[in-house]
Design a protein with these regions (language model features):
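Active-site neighborhoods and metal-handling regions in enzymes and metal-associated proteins
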Residues: 1-402
C-alpha cells in the first residue's frame, strides 16, 4: 500500500544563496529568542509572510494553505506545504518539515511534532485567524498563548546594515522604473502599456543585481486623470490626453523587501491652478523630509506638515498619513504600523529606521486643479538627520512630459 505520511522532509537539491548571511539571521533570531525568554515562552509559531521571511528568508505562496516558522531555544523549523516540494528548504535558514495533503490539518500535526503539548506558545494575534487559533488549542493544548505581533514588528522597524544596503538597491531600482515611465509617456498611450515598460525595466535590473534571488511581486501603478484620486488605484486602459495629471508609482520587490518611488507628472502642459497645487505639495514634501530627524516623534512630524497645509487652506484635501516604514512588506503583507506618520503614532525616530515622506492632496472633479498630487521619497534616519535614498527629481522642472 502506498504510504501516506502526515509530514516528511524534502531536502531536494542544494540550498540556495539566501537574501542575507547566516550571521544576519542568527542575530535576528537571537533577539526573538530573548523576547521569548523574557515572556516565559518555550516556542514561537510565526505564521505571517513577513515574519517568516524576516527570520529565515523564506517567502511563501499560501494559495489557501497555512505556513509557519517554529522557533525554540534550539531549533528553527519552517512548516511548509507539500505542493512546494523542496523549494522552502532550499530557500530557508534552518530546517524545513513538509506536511502532506492526505488529510486535513496535517499542518497542525507537523507543528505538534516539533513543539509537543502543553507549552507556552508565542504567536501572531494579528495574523492567525480565529479558526486557526482554535486548532492551535486543540492540537497543541498550550498552557498559555502570548501575542508576539507587536514585539516582532518593533524589531523589524529597526533596520540592520545589511537591510539598509538592500533597501538602497531597491530605491535605485525604483528610480530606474521612474525614468522608464517618464520616457514612455506620450499622447494616446495607455496606462497599462506604460506600467508594463517600467515593470519590465525594474525586473531586469533586479535580476542583474541579484542573480541568485527569486523574482516576484514587482509592480507599477501608473494613473492618469481621474484615476489619480486614490493612491492605490489599479492600472487601467485609459489613454493619455494633453494636460492630464499623472501619478507615477514604481514598486520593486527584492527578496520580500518593498521600496518605492512616487511622483506627480503632467502630459505636455500644466494649468496655473494645477501648478499651484503641485508646487504646494512639493513644498510640503520638502518640509516633511526636513522634519524627519532622530529624536522627533511620528506625531510631531505629522503635526508639522498638517500646519503647513492648514496655512495654505489645503488640509481638507489631505488623503492619508504622510509616510510609513519600509522593510519586509508589500501591499498584502507586512505593515509596520508602529512607524507611520500619523497623529496617533508617538514612536520616536531613531537612527536605522527607514521611512517615507509622501504627502498627497486629492481635489475632486469640478474643482480647479482637480486630481491627486503625491510625491514620495524613502529616507534613512541617521545620527545627525536623514539620507534621501531616491534620486529621481520631483516637481515641474523634469516632470512635464510627453
Amino acid at each position: 500500500m502506498t504510504p501516506r505520511p502526515e509530514f516528511y522532509h524534502i531536502h531536494n537539491g542544494e540550498q540556495a544563496v539566501l537574501p542575507f548571511s547566516d550571521s544576519e539571521y542568527e542575530a535576528r533570531l537571537e533577539v526573538l529568542r530573548a523576547s521569548l525568554e523574557a515572556q516565559d515562552c518555550s516556542a514561537a509559531i510565526l505564521t505571517s509572510m513577513h515574519n517568516i521571511a524576516y527570520y529565515c528568508g523564506f517567502l511563501y505562496c499560501a494559495f489557501g494553505r497555512p505556513y509557519a516558522l517554529i522557533v525554540t531555544a534550539q531549533t528553527t523549523v519552517v512548516i511548509s506545504a507539500g505542493i512546494d516540494a523542496g523549494q522552502p528548504w532550499r530557500r530557508c535558514y534552518g530546517d524545513c518539515l513538509t506536511y502532506s495533503d492526505w488529510q486535513r490539518d496535517n499542518f497542525w500535526r507537523a507543528v505538534h511534532h516539533v513543539i509537543g503539548l502543553g507549552q507556552e506558545i508565542g504567536y501572531e494575534a494579528d495574523h492567525l485567524t480565529m479558526a486557526q487559533c482554535a486548532k492551535l488549542d486543540v492540537f497543541l493544548k498550550p498552557s498559555r498563548r502570548v501575542d508576539l505581533a507587536a514585539a516582532t514588528m518593533r524589531q523589524r522597524m529597526q533596520k540592520s546594515p545589511a537591510e539598509i544596503a538592500l533597501i538602497r538597491h531597491g530605491a535605485q531600482v525604483a528610480d530606474i522604473g521612474g525614468y522608464a515611465v517618464r520616457d514612455a509617456v506620450q499622447l494616446g498611450a495607455r496606462e497599462i502599456d506604460i506600467a508594463m515598460v517600467a515593470r519590465d525595466a525594474m525586473e531586469a535590473e533586479i535580476a542583474r543585481r541579484f542573480p541568485d534571488a527569486e523574482y516576484r511581486d514587482t509592480w507599477v501603478w501608473f494613473q492618469s486623470g481621474i484615476n489619480t484620486d486614490g493612491a492605490h488605484n489599479p492600472v487601467t486602459g485609459r489613454r493619455l490626453e494633453r494636460g492630464d495629471i499623472l501619478s507615477l508609482n514604481t514598486f520593486p520587490m527584492i527578496n520580500g523587501y518593498y521600496t518605492a518611488l512616487e511622483r506627480t507628472l503632467f502630459v505636455q502642459d500644466v494649468d496655473k491652478d494645477s501648478l499651484r497645487l503641485w508646487q504646494a505639495n512639493v513644498a510640503a514634501h520638502e518640509l516633511g523630509m526636513g522634519l524627519l530627524q532622530p529624536g522627533v516623534s511620528c506625531a510631531a512630524v505629522t503635526a508639522g506638515v498638517n500646519r503647513f497645509f492648514e496655512e495654505h487652506d489645503l488640509l481638507q484635501y489631505r488623503s492619508f498619513g504622510y509616510g510609513h516604514s519600509f522593510g519586509v512588506l508589500s501591499h498584502y503583507y507586512g505593515r509596520e504600523a508602529g512607524l507611520e506618520l500619523r497623529e496617533d503614532v508617538e514612536t520616536v525616530l531613531t537612527p536605522g529606521m527607514v521611512i517615507s515622506m509622501e504627502p498627497m492632496l486629492t481635489l475632486p472633479k469640478g474643482l480647479p486643479g482637480a486630481g491627486g498630487y503625491r510625491e514620495h521619497d524613502i529616507l534613512l534616519i541617521t545620527e545627525d538627520g536623514n539620507e534621501r535614498l531616491n534620486a529621481y527629481p520631483y516637481g515641474p522642472d523634469l516632470n512635464i512630459v510627453g
